[in-house]
Swiss-Prot record:
Compartment annotation: Cell membrane
Signal peptide location: none
Membrane-traversing stretches: 404-424, 470-490, 551-571, 593-613, 641-661, 762-782, 811-831, 915-935
Gene symbol of the encoding locus: ANO3
Key word Transmembrane present: yes
GO molecular function: chloride channel activity; phospholipid scramblase activity; protein dimerization activity
Segments of skewed composition (Polar residues): 1-22
Protein topology in the membrane: Multi-pass membrane protein
Name of the protein: Anoctamin-3
Protein function: Has calcium-dependent phospholipid scramblase activity; scrambles phosphatidylcholine and galactosylceramide. Seems to act as potassium channel regulator and may inhibit pain signaling; can facilitate KCNT1/Slack channel activity by promoting its full single-channel conductance at very low sodium concentrations and by increasing its sodium sensitivity. Does not exhibit calcium-activated chloride channel (CaCC) activity.
Tissues and organs where the protein is expressed, per its UniProt entry: Highly expressed in the forebrain striatum.
Keyword terms of this UniProt record: Cell membrane, Disease variant, Dystonia, Glycoprotein, Lipid transport, Membrane, Transmembrane, Transmembrane helix, Transport
Amino acid sequence: MVHHSGSIQSFKQQKGMNISKSEITKETSLKPSRRSLPCLAQSYAYSKSLSQSTSLFQSTESESQAPTSITLISTDKAEQVNTEENKNDSVLRCSFADLSDFCLALGKDKDYTDESEHATYDRSRLINDFVIKDKSEFKTKLSKNDMNYIASSGPLFKDGKKRIDYILVYRKTNIQYDKRNTFEKNLRAEGLMLEKEPAIASPDIMFIKIHIPWDTLCKYAERLNIRMPFRKKCYYTDGRSKSMGRMQTYFRRIKNWMAQNPMVLDKSAFPDLEESDCYTGPFSRARIHHFIINNKDTFFSNATRSRIVYHMLERTKYENGISKVGIRKLINNGSYIAAFPPHEGAYKSSQPIKTHGPQNNRHLLYERWARWGMWYKHQPLDLIRLYFGEKIGLYFAWLGWYTGMLIPAAIVGLCVFFYGLFTMNNSQVSQEICKATEVFMCPLCDKNCSLQRLNDSCIYAKVTYLFDNGGTVFFAIFMAIWATVFLEFWKRRRSILTYTWDLIEWEEEEETLRPQFEAKYYKMEIVNPITGKPEPHQPSSDKVTRLLVSVSGIFFMISLVITAVFGVVVYRLVVMEQFASFKWNFIKQYWQFATSAAAVCINFIIIMLLNLAYEKIAYLLTNLEYPRTESEWENSFALKMFLFQFVNLNSSIFYIAFFLGRFVGHPGKYNKLFDRWRLEECHPSGCLIDLCLQMGVIMFLKQIWNNFMELGYPLIQNWWSRHKIKRGIHDASIPQWENDWNLQPMNLHGLMDEYLEMVLQFGFTTIFVAAFPLAPLLALLNNIIEIRLDAYKFVTQWRRPLPARATDIGIWLGILEGIGILAVITNAFVIAITSDYIPRFVYEYKYGPCANHVEPSENCLKGYVNNSLSFFDLSELGMGKSGYCRYRDYRGPPWSSKPYEFTLQYWHILAARLAFIIVFEHLVFGIKSFIAYLIPDVPKGLHDRIRREKYLVQEMMYEAELEHLQQQRRKSGQPVHHEWP
């Protein structure tokens, strides 16, 4: 009998090939990485009869050896262990190919039939086919993992055997009988099993439970190129890796002596995450003998089964005609009202999890992740991925990474703020404004405004200094570098996750055409240069025409936003005179603050109202383009929504930052809108306080509104759904799928709203951070709540979403990089244009006491306020007063040769502003590019490991095929060759 250990070394010895030192390695010298989810099935113990058969394939001897070697034995030439000590642990040894033949036999078992034959098979036959010395030895107590598997297998058909993979819901009173009947008939013809059951609480509701059997799973897994495990991993180690391994061992021992980090999850609380380490390859029925199939029921994970069923639902016809296809169209026309995979059970248990363990993965996620008491803990990303799929897992991984990276940004921003707070009373500018009791400012409006003392702006000056001080430039540069570091290290983190979750080559293999695209362009086909198969094609002229229409719609919506901002500007101009003559003394005294606050609230209401229209218009424009794949559709829709909402949120902020008070003219010659309303001016301390107010209010109100819509609204809806259930029906009597039906569905656009909210927040945190250094702190506090709020929503308030796969966060990464570039430009303009940093700098080194480069005995900014205010003759205003008032500008006095013309200092400041913008941008962009160059997207060790695994996969596929051919020759009585025939 030829025995194969499954390693490259033994294979090459049989082949007479040379073996390099790098290939002589044992897996025990390295800690295995946890990569392939389908291997998770191997760590479970299954139901009683099934565990009896599968336990035959594992020996205690092989378990003690290197984890890559798979020692299996032949069923036709079984060898009994003849030692007395193995009496209670008898094991059969078979070859790798024999196990594959056994698994093939399962799929061809005559007792395993389709739905018409009740879809049952006699598992007892599997046990009787083997040599078993003592049947009593298999009566073992189920372990914690056993119970977890049984509980996590999800709801079942009435026979208690077939797992429910998907749920369809419709109303009995709906008249779309023919469409449903045709659709369900076609589903059965495709190999799915259906079972109908009426709702308990609502007699009008009917549920269709869907189960996908083994043969259908295999067929579609091959069609979709789903990667499945076929061999345990072996690892490459060199001298450096071994020395590093020893160092890690020493560090691990030292770490064990130290106190445990309270943020780290207790791994013992997640027994289901102990995965075997396997190589994976595209599934093929012709090469099924290559794959590790310990049990058919768990070979394909719940997420994979749901994805395959959904793929079939999306491509099954319900009427004659190429476009009459897909469950989504049936939901849109009312034939069905919902389609979703079921949750694995209740998320709460009457028994404490510490003593009785988790009832299912949903319960475990709630207790260890979604509860508010776990806000300080790391996220169980592997379990999130296992339950919700890789796409949602990547979202929470990115959100957690973003939140963690906000900690240093928030700390530095808080330090800048406290620096301004502690030095506020020592600010020369604030002191001069607060002491200017004899300086009168010109009226800020035409009718109801009067002269104001400069010291009336004392509070504004001190508050402005909190955000406009010496640390502003440093913080702007820091945040630009922070954004680059955040994105570059996220790319590395993403590459590690995609490798760990076996997503390296997924996009190339599994991306399929959208049914709508296929139905629209089925008459125009071209040969795909990659696959060599014909597929529908969208002509270039048609694509360009649709894109032009879509772009026109985008510009129209952006114009609508700008129009709304213009309306708010007009409102500010109209009401500022009304507030200046208001009866309430507080509003009359602080009329500028009241005008800004009211405008911010109105602007926020307009933002929320326009958002309702944006989503529908973006949806229509995206469908008009007919994207080729689902990822293209999601990227196009996400880009439109981002452009709409970004302009909607930030247009008013851009107005305040770069236009407010810039084009007002001067006393006696003010610029007016429509020759009627005088343009708004900044108060003597500048416009930065208006920008801070606008950002703070919008950021705060929007976060509250988003949190309410994400959690409060679903809570109210779910409460109302439960309230409508008939009285006298206990929750325990309602099946899981009916409880899921009473939950709210995940929105139609998936994670788009979640990403959009965070990306817009990232824009707030970086684009105008020079004006609002507390933005990272507010974002951090919000995200700590956001993670648990989203977790609670996914686990308890939403139906289980389709466990979709993804390799990255999609178009959002490019948008984040674009925001990082825009942030450098806007912060340069905010510092140079909006703040008074450049005028103070020019005065300090050109016009102030320190201009002569002599060691001064007084502050270099002494006299700055008086220098920054120009004079105007009150007699020219027609107010019946004489003397002079002051206004913010650099113009000549009335007694000069060129009164009210710009002075030389104005042009010096303008040149300094432009020079600062150029120097700042080039310096920061250079630093960002250098950092991005230093940080590779994929760690070198991971890159080498991926290349090594590709090589080993080819070798192992060759070895497995050779084993299979040898087994076939042995059965047919032909001589066994150790090389290819």
